[in-house]
Curated annotation (Swiss-Prot):
Its main location: cytoplasm. Catalyzes the attachment of threonine to tRNA(Thr) in a two-step reaction: L-threonine is first activated by ATP to form Thr-AMP and then transferred to the acceptor end of tRNA(Thr). Also edits incorrectly charged L-seryl-tRNA(Thr). GO terms for molecular function: ATP binding; catalytic activity, acting on a protein; metal ion binding; threonine-tRNA ligase activity; transferase activity; tRNA binding. Its EC number is 6.1.1.3. Residues 1-64 form the TGS domain. Pfam families: HGTP_anticodon, TGS, tRNA-synt_2b, tRNA_SAD. HAMAP family: Thr_tRNA_synth. Keywords: Aminoacyl-tRNA synthetase, ATP-binding, Cytoplasm, Ligase, Metal-binding, Nucleotide-binding, Protein biosynthesis, RNA-binding, tRNA-binding, Zinc. The lineage of its organism: Bacteria, Bacillati, Bacillota, Bacilli, Bacillales. This is Threonine--tRNA ligase 2. It catalyses: tRNA(Thr) + L-threonine + ATP = L-threonyl-tRNA(Thr) + AMP + diphosphate + H(+). Homodimer. Its cofactor is Zn(2+). It comes from Bacillus subtilis (strain 168). The gene is thrZ.
Length: 638
């Protein structure tokens, strides 16, 4: 038997090592600097600890702290340090789970006292002590019974509950650092001293295991990075995000509200409705030019429709129901089935296709109260859904046109975006060959358009693969909005047909398409992206006119009337307040243009223009200002 293993590195080189060499030792053989930066290893695609021993031939890559995978390991270990610090400080603590999330981590726990934000400083101090102790982190494999006995002795009832979900007979992995032991799959850093930059950010409540029937635990959130400068940059971003929080700005700018009478369901105030109307108008213009017909379907439809479509199996736990005339109806969680019924209502020839059907459809999906987040996570929202019914030979050309439409929308708002191709999920419908052909078709379209994309394994819709578009906002946060989905299943379920050139009935293919996704969510994203300072074409009030004194009101009203006639949303601040106060108020409301009008402006039929975010005022003829503004609005300029 060979005493060596052959290990293939990422560059294709094959190295021979003694059997049983650890990942850390292998990294050191490549370079000492790589060993210092190493956080974990990836053996045949699986993340493992640096202490993992190579006992057979394998592919190996070293995961460094500056990689995304390395940061996840760092953050996971920091979550364990958090839990250890809390147990040291507060004694009787029952630990839940402590996963890695985007940019950070959290740990759920049951304490004898309620934590407040003021407690975070003390916890951070103890975490730094643990880091300075540079405790070795050991992976320990135990039997189910040994793990059960250990956590029973420690009175860790939540860990015991997690254990119950693991089949008896399976090996259990624990991680130990000093006196602290946790149930965990890992991997982790080799020692606590490798953590250099972290910050606890907030405390909140969370249902144990996300179930509202369970007790509420305390959740402590934190962030961690390889370097302090990265942490500082992230904390600065969080400060900016707090300033741009759409919930705060929505209230400040009078855009929307929520009420306990309809939890998770937004009320649009007049100014907010203006913005929403502009978004819909923009979309309608583009869709009309692209050959879409707009339709409207009922909010509530028979339960059997959702069973027929397949949505019942995937959405029933999140649907709202009502009984009418002894028949059970459901508020629609999706617009798709209604569009299938509309298509089925008419007879189509192959010459009629594609049929492009669009709707601003209001849908309802129940979310747990703890998951609600302003406009970003609601229980009812408007989806800009379209369904394109095509022949098979039209699939790729129609997807290309849908992508071009999405690109035009996002460029108008100044969004960069990335693309994902999401493949077959476990709960999918249909045969393998159809899925493979569909995935190849979507990939071919993206490649022909020169769009780079990532594969998102297993995240397709249950009826077909999809292309997802992730926009980046001003703070470089990613939001998945637009989607294009290919569907061979729905036409089968609804027995949809058209007449082909041989006078035979054949199935169309359906392309599902959304650009904004949820208009309500997109609105919330826009508020944060622009910090509430909308482009002039979207702004609820585009021009605020302020008289120097009441004697200038007539001229102000004349200017307002002409602007309104030109389609500009213009207001006048006629309040009996000081000029400086009125100007500051218009800045707080983030109005794009403020016109301060006095004797000089009236005599010359001019305006004194203050643009939001600009230091310099400009004195220009009124007609020049109006013409320039009208053109800016028409072009939907930034």
């Amino acid at each position: 038997m060979s005493k060596h293993v052959h290990i293939q590195l990422p560059d294709g080189q094959i190295q021979e090592y003694p059997k049983g060499i650890t990942i850390k030792e292998a990294a050191g053989s490549i370079s000492s600097s790589l060993q210092k930066k190493a956080a974990a290893g990836q053996v045949n695609g699986k993340l493992v600890d640096l202490s993992f021993k190579l006992e057979e031939d394998a592919e190996l890559s070293i995961v460094t702290l500056d990689s995304q995978e390395g940061l996840q390991v760092l953050r996971h270990t920091t979550a364990h340090v958090l839990a250890q610090a809390v147990k040291r400080l507060y004694g009787e603590v029952s630990l839940g789970v402590g996963p890695v999330i985007l940019d950070g981590f959290y740990y759920d726990m049951k304490l004898g006292k309620s934590l407040a934000s003021g407690d975070l400083e003390a916890i951070e101090k103890e975490m730094k002590n643990i880091i300075n102790e540079n405790l070795e982190i050991k992976r320990i494999e135990v039997s189910y019974e040994e793990a059960e006995e250990l956590f029973a002795q420690k009175d860790e009832r939540l860990k015991l509950e997690i254990l119950k979900d693991i089949p008896r007979g399976e090996d259990i992995t624990l991680y130990q650092q000093g006196e602290f032991v946790d149930l965990c799959r890992g991997p982790h850093l080799p020692s606590t001293g490798m953590i250099k930059a972290f910050k606890l950010t907030r405390v909140s409540g969370a249902y144990w295991r996300g179930d509202s029937k369970n007790e509420v635990l305390q959740r402590v959130y934190g962030v961690a990075f390889q370097k302090k400068k990265d942490l500082d940059a992230h904390l600065h971003m969080l400060e900016e995000a707090a300033k741009r929080d759409h919930r705060k700005l929505g209230k400040q700018l009078g855009l929307f509200m929520f009420s306990e009478e309809a939890p998770g369901m937004p009320f649009y105030l007049p100014k907010g409705q203006i913005v929403r109307n502009e978004l819909e108008r923009f979309s309608r213009e583009l869709q009309t030019n692209a050959g879409y017909d707009e339709v409207r379907t009922p909010f509530m439809m028979n339960q059997r429709l959702w069973e027929q479509s397949g949505h019942w199996d995937h959405y029933r736990d999140n649907m709202y129901f009502s009984e009418v005339d002894d028949t059970r109806f459901a508020m629609k969680p999706m617009n798709c089935p209604g569009h299938m019924l509309i298509f089925k209502n008419s007879l189509y020839s192959y010459r009629d296709l594609p049929i492009r059907m669009a709707e601003f459809g209001q849908v309802h999906r129940h979310e747990y109260s703890g998951a609600l987040n302003g406009m970003l996570r609601v229980r009812t929202f408007c989806q800009d859904d379209a369904h394109i019914f095509v022949r098979e030979d039209q699939i790729e050309s129609e997807i290309k046109e849908a992508i071009r439409l999405i690109d035009e929308v996002y460029r108008t708002f100044g969004f960069e975006y990335s693309v994902e191709l999401s493949t077959r999920p476990e709960d999918s419908l249909g045969d393998d060959s159809l899925w493979e052909a569909s995935e190849r078709a979507l990939a071919r379209v993206l490649e022909e358009l020169g769009l780079s994309y990532e594969i998102n394994e297993g995240d397709g819709a249950f009826y077909g693969p999809k292309i997802d578009f992730h926009i980046k906002d001003a703070l470089k946060r990613s939001h998945q909005c637009a989607t294009i989905q290919l569907d061979f299943q729905m036409p089968e379920k609804f027995d949809l047909t058209y007449i082909n050139e041989l006078n035979e009935k054949v199935r169309p293919v359906v392309i599902h398409r959304a650009v904004f996704g949820s208009i309500d969510r997109f609105f919330g994203i826009l508020i944060e992206h622009y910090g509430g300072a909308f482009p002039v074409w979207l702004a609820p009030i585009q021009v605020q006119i302020i008289p120097v004194s009441h004697v200038h009101l007539d001229y102000c009203r004349k200017v307002q009337a002409e602007l309104k006639q030109a389609g500009i949303r213009a207001g006048i601040d006629e309040r009996n307040e000081k000029l400086g106060y009125k100007i500051r108020e218009s800045q707080v409301q983030k109005i794009p243009y403020v016109l301060v009008l006095g004797d000089h402006e009236e005599q010359e039929n001019a305006v004194n223009v203050r643009r939001f975010g600009h230091q310099q005022n400009e004195h220009v003829p009124f007609q020049t200002f109006k013409d320039k503004l009208v053109k800016q609005v028409e072009n939907r300029g930034m």
